[in-house]
From Swiss-Prot:
It is an enzyme of class 1 (oxidoreductase). It is found in: Cytoplasm. It comes from Corynebacterium melassecola. This is Pyrroline-5-carboxylate reductase. Gene3D superfamilies: NAD(P)-binding Rossmann-like Domain, ProC C-terminal domain-like. Catalyzes the reduction of 1-pyrroline-5-carboxylate (PCA) to L-proline. Belongs to the pyrroline-5-carboxylate reductase family. Keywords: Amino-acid biosynthesis, Cytoplasm, NADP, Oxidoreductase, Proline biosynthesis. PANTHER family: PYRROLINE-5-CARBOXYLATE REDUCTASE (PTHR11645), PYRROLINE-5-CARBOXYLATE REDUCTASE 3 (PTHR11645:SF0). Pathway: Amino-acid biosynthesis; L-proline biosynthesis; L-proline from L-glutamate 5-semialdehyde: step 1/1.
Length: 270
């Protein structure tokens, strides 16, 4: 039976735990560490997992160790547990869920030959609709990578990418939920400005975006084709799209994505 260690029981760590348990994994095979005893107790009561405060204890004989801590702590935690990982009877796989920390930096902080996987998650994994990308280190074999993908698939979709694409991936999936939250927020405000109650405007906007996303995913059609299907000649939608285009919406997304990728690259240098 696979044993999982989750170092850090924050939002991302809890989302992973929730997904694994929903996929019928035995909670007694999931160890979660927290600096806060209160938080650890909360997760134990909610999910029935094993709550620990010692990272090395959690990593002991774990098959997969997920590092769900802030980027600045990744190397520190890896250095802390590397001795335990060396002594495990079977080779453990370490999975970093933090932005900005390269595979090379992690491999240098651990003993030679440690399998390391770098993941770029996003927050919709909190509701089982995440988009996680995986990049394998040089010591990860096909079976180990497949195991990590299977575990991550419990909280959404998974895609393998090259590490050289991570900055672009950060702009496209890691940060993009925030773009959509902002667009939704703006549309809700527009609805209120038109005289709708805020609750009504929110319901209309959120349900419409959810439906549109489902159409793009399930029909396989290009977004431009789906947009054309809503845009009758000289109609209301065409009038709205014209305003958005004249306001420079495409350029705004180009610049936002570039700024995000640039910042991701900058963080990766430190």
């Amino acid at each position: 039976m696979t044993t999982i260690a989750v170092i850090g029981g924050g939002q991302i760590g809890e989302a992973l735990v929730s997904g694994l348990i929903a996929a019928n994994m035995n909670p007694q095979n999931i160890r979660v560490t927290n600096r806060s005893e209160e938080r650890g107790q909360e997760l134990r009561d909610r999910y029935g997992i094993l709550n620990m405060t010692d990272n090395s204890q959690a990593a002991d004989e774990a098959d997969v160790v997920f590092l769900c801590v802030k980027p600045k702590f990744i190397v520190e935690v890896l250095s802390e547990i590397t001795g335990t990982l060396d002594n495990n009877s079977a080779q453990s796989v370490v999975v970093s869920m933090a932005a900005g920390i390269s595979i090379a930096a992690m491999e240098e902080s651990a003993s030679a030959g440690l399998p390391v996987v770098r993941v770029m998650p996003n927050t919709p994994m909190l509701v089982g609709k995440g988009m996680s990308t995986v990049t394998k280190g040089r010591y990860v074999d096909a079976e180990q990578l497949e195991q990590v993908k299977d575990l991550l698939s419990t909280v959404g979709d998974v895609l393998e990418v090259a590490e050289s694409d991570i900055d672009a991936v950060t702009a496209m999936s890691g940060s993009s939920p925030a773009y959509l939250f902002l667009v939704t927020e703006a549309l809700i405000e527009a609805g209120v400005n038109l005289g709708l109650p805020r609750a009504t405007a929110k319901k209309l906007a959120v349900a419409s975006f959810e439906g549109a996303a489902t159409m793009m995913k399930e029909t396989g059609k290009e977004p431009s084709e789906l947009r054309a299907g809503v845009s009758s000649p000289a109609g209301t939608t065409v009038a709205a799209i014209r305003e958005l285009e004249e306001s420079g919406i495409r350029g705004a997304f180009y610049r936002a994505a570039q700024a995000c990728a640039d910042r991701s690259e900058e963080l990766g240098k430190h």
